[in-house]
């Protein structure tokens, strides 16, 4: 015969069971809380242009996949990470993922970050080697640890512990050949002066871009992808192989919150591609979100950030004949209303997916002409 429970014992027993069941069903930091958001938000995914170029085996692009998953009920960040994985795994993308152009030693080191607006959680990895999809590792940093950023061997060890296959010497054959050509051009120019050496490395890479050996976009690489669903839940992710031929250990803006990516679930999201050092110095994604908080449209917020970057670019080596920045830098942003924009230092393109399907659109630009003018 079963023992009869009094009311106090019943409440204590059922409460404990409910808590245990709930804890077993969710990741370490829990599910996103229920949010009260304005009705009528139109779902949107906005990304750099490679978000509507690389395709999976079914011919689906990053923004299309993310939008379909998101509007089908998937968590927004899950959808975005699945979308950028298409680009990370594309062997023709030498600026993102395992096939990205390596560092000066011929080693591929990847960076990624993600932010979950409703959960107010973030995760990032920098300088991780031997992993094909760093954005997913960054997501697990957010979900399974109390940290926001893991770097180098520590990031790799964490990925291994999470079940990722670590591939030693992971490099795409095309990227390896391009690295060898860069080495051939720069070995005679290894000066004792670090500044001269760095400039020689950079100039050799840009010359390879001019000759068509490297796609200019892939020299800096990166994909940023941000999304908002019909409930107004906002997330973002940025992933990259970083600057081609970088000094080993260099981390740019992509894994740094506030630079390569920033999300405030009540305001909006912003992310970037282009010259990481210039973006990192100005924490531009944070600036954009704060401008949107003050009421600025995403386009105007991004223009404000670009003007700050231009104002703080004073080294002659970084200026063209017009006295303007001689590099590319682009921002992709959206606000809590579902308004979005792609804005660049110079004319470029970006990707977006709405109920009208995936599109590649022209960015708004701070300057006319080209960075090299």
Positions of predicted regions on the chain:
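N-terminal secretory signal peptides
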Residues: 1-5
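Alpha/propeptide regions of enzymes that mature by internal proteolysis
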Residues: 12-20, 31-373
